Every structure is written in structure tokens, then in C-alpha cells.
């Protein structure tokens, strides 16, 4: 009887703990992402990203005449909808844009945002497992530490990609992507999808174009750049590349 009483107390305690857990529903869908195109380059002196974003969306169900994008610690320079200057409000890390008309479900529109991302000014906190949530990380950007390689890379889980590009930063959104990334010519880049082209510029930089047609959540967007060596391998007939620092090649 005593054992039964102890078990009942334990079950009651577990039930109370379960009730105290915060229910986290998925974000309400008002607009759906369709495609995201980005052009980015980097201000190493300030650890900032200069960006242009073309975001194609469509209403989820009900007609709408506005869209709200997550954009954390940005400086917004210009906003357009379908190539027309648009009114907007930027506050509390959200960019709310007035559309040029009311759009219905299935009707697409494209928002253009010219911006500066400032990850060092992001105030949001990370999770228990991922302590920081800056989204974009500059490693020794001024090349001051001979023991550290200069690198740029991102970590978007779960809602930190909006620290470096405007988006609906929710795991229940899906979008295809294109990224044009301009970096010092000595850098190797990596992103989602496949490398489509590389163009050498006349100022010591190179622009790499990465494209991924398969739709995925915004937190899975990735860019990386640094002085990497690429080690080629295969597995079960599939190409596998390893991006490593040169001394580990």
C-alpha cells in the first residue's frame, strides 16, 4: 500500500510539471514565403552585412494588403513592392510593409529591401542549447589574431536567420533561395544548393552565386566564407566535399 501511495505522489508531481510547460504553437500564417533572393557583401571593420533582398510571397488564405517580416537590428535603407517605393514601419525588430494593393491567395508579389544587418547589436537571447542568437558571426574580421582564421558563417536555428536577412523567420515557412555573395578573392564560400557561377571583380573581390530550388525553412539558410581548402570525396557514388582550414587538409 505504501508503494502505491508513493507512485501516486510521483505521478501527481509529473502531471503538475507537465501542466507548467509552456505550449508553443506554430506561428500563425498570414503570408507564405515563396522565393528568397539575396545579394550580400561584408563590412569587416564594423562586423556588418550590406544586403539586398527580393522576397516573393503570397497570402496564406485571406486577402491582405500588408506583410510583416522579421528583421533584427537592421538599418533599413529602402523598401519596394513590385518595384514601387512602399511605405513601411520598422520597430521591435519587425518590418511591416504596406503593399501596393490587396493580394488574394495564390497571387504573388515581391518585396525588395535594401538594408544593413548589424549582428553585434542583436539583443535576443539564445536557447539552452544554442547560447547566442546573433545569426551571423564574424571571426577575427580585422585579422588581428594570428592564431585565428578570418571567417564568416551563420547559424539560424531556430529564428536567427532574420539577424542577417529579412524574412518570416518561422520553422513552418518554406522558401527556395538564391544568394549572390561578394567576398575577398582569397576566400572560399559555401551556401545551400549548388554553386552556379563565380565572377572576379576589379576591386579584389569575387561574387559567388549559389542556388537551391528545394524549399526549406529560413533557419536552414547558410553562408560561410574563409580561407578554406576543399577536400573532395565520394560516398556511395555521391560527391562529398569537406571544407577545412588549410593546415588540416
Give each language-model segment a name:
Residues 1-24:
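Bacterial Sec-dependent N-terminal signal peptides
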Residues 18-249:
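Acidic/His-enriched low-complexity segments
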